[in-house]
From Swiss-Prot:
The gene is folD. This is Bifunctional protein FolD. Pathway: One-carbon metabolism; tetrahydrofolate interconversion. Catalyzes the oxidation of 5,10-methylenetetrahydrofolate to 5,10-methenyltetrahydrofolate and then the hydrolysis of 5,10-methenyltetrahydrofolate to 10-formyltetrahydrofolate. Its EC number is 1.5.1.5, 3.5.4.9. HAMAP family: THF_DHG_CYH (MF_01576).
Length: 311
């Protein structure tokens, strides 16, 4: 019988942990405050991003933190990148801002590399600056370091459910900069044997069928895409596999969500499985809060975060 890897307990415990640290930060005269930059004016992306941001804001406000939203998508396209770079520079130096989140995906005419090179690594709550990315290769501490939210959230779920990745054959489907790519590096650091599959990979079913752990982060469900769609079903996996579903897309017309993983068929064979709703999403939100606490200590000390209490 499948064990559901739910994110609610991790989310609740992380918020409780964060509230304790908010009180500790008061000794430094610091209140965690997240600045959120929205640059993408695509109607579908904008609607989705606003929903994501509202959930993140609710979490942060619930621990006693603050959130400020900057709607840069209202700037003309030709001025948006410059406006973002200037704002990031100002926020980097603002003592009352302890974390900065540039919501992805960015519009195609904004240079992502320039944006994240300008962002201070001390306030980078998504772990996307070059300096913070280096930590994935040189070694990381799951409790002390600023790490990409979804990959770190997944690893925290594994820890909570006592899923050991050492020596396991792990397939990561998708090589995106937010999930697939950083997660594959982090898993290798934890001594997993990792295979990354992408749009040009041949015979993806073969690799998935032989994997102990499958993490699917594609977001191209066949219900919405005819070009290179992806759906993980039960006939793809071996008996007893661990399956984590990350990818999903909303139908712009019906507003219905479609996901990478077919829950019903996969649940019949998997030993552990994340639900499409209430799984990785909650873990991602929890990690964002944790990262904000870490960056808040960094801002408070301007040196490095103290050793934080493990959950």
């Amino acid at each position: 019988m499948v064990v559901w890897i739910k994110g609610d307990r991790l989310h609740t415990e992380t918020l409780e942990w964060a509230r304790r640290h908010v009180k500790e930060l008061e000794r430094y005269g610091v209140t965690p405050k997240l600045a959120v930059l929205l640059l993408n004016d695509d109607p579908i992306e904008l609607e989705t991003q606003h929903k994501y941001v509202s959930l993140k804001a609710r979490d942060i406000k619930s621990i006693g933190g603050e959130v400020e939203l900057f709607e840069l998508y209202k700037e003309p396209p030709e001025k948006r990148e410059v406006a973002a770079l200037k704002l990031i520079e100002r926020l980097n130096n603002a003592d009352d801002v302890t974390g900065i989140l540039v919501q992805k995906p960015l519009p195609p005419y904004v240079d992502e590399t320039k944006i994240f090179e300008r962002l201070s690594p001390l306030k980078d709550v998504d772990g996307l600056t070059p300096e913070n990315k280096k930590r994935l290769v040189t070694g990381f501490d799951l409790d002390r370091d600023i790490l990409p939210c979804t990959p770190a959230g997944i690893l925290e779920l594994f820890r909570q459910y006592k899923i050991d990745v050492r020596g396991k054959d792990v397939v990561v489907v998708g090589k995106g900069t937010l999930v697939g790519f950083p997660l594959s590096i982090m898993l290798m650091q934890l001594d997993a044997t990792v295979t990354v599959l992408h749009a040009l990979s041949k015979d993806r079913k073969y690799y998935v069928r032989n994997a102990d752990i499958i993490i699917s982060a594609v977001g191209r469900p066949p219900e919405l895409y005819s070009d290179n769609p992806w759906k993980l079903t039960g006939d793809f996996i071996k008996e007893g596999a661990v399956v984590v579903g990350v990818g999903g897309k909303v139908d712009p017309v019906t507003k219905k969500w479609y996901f990478d993983v077919d829950e019903k068929s996969v649940a019949e064979k998997a030993s552990y499985l994340t639900p499409n709703i209430g799984g990785v999403g909650l873990a991602t939100r929890a990690r964002l809060v944790k990262n904000l606490i870490i960056t808040s200590y960094m801002v408070a000390t301007r040196v490095a975060s103290p050793r934080l209490l493990a959950l």
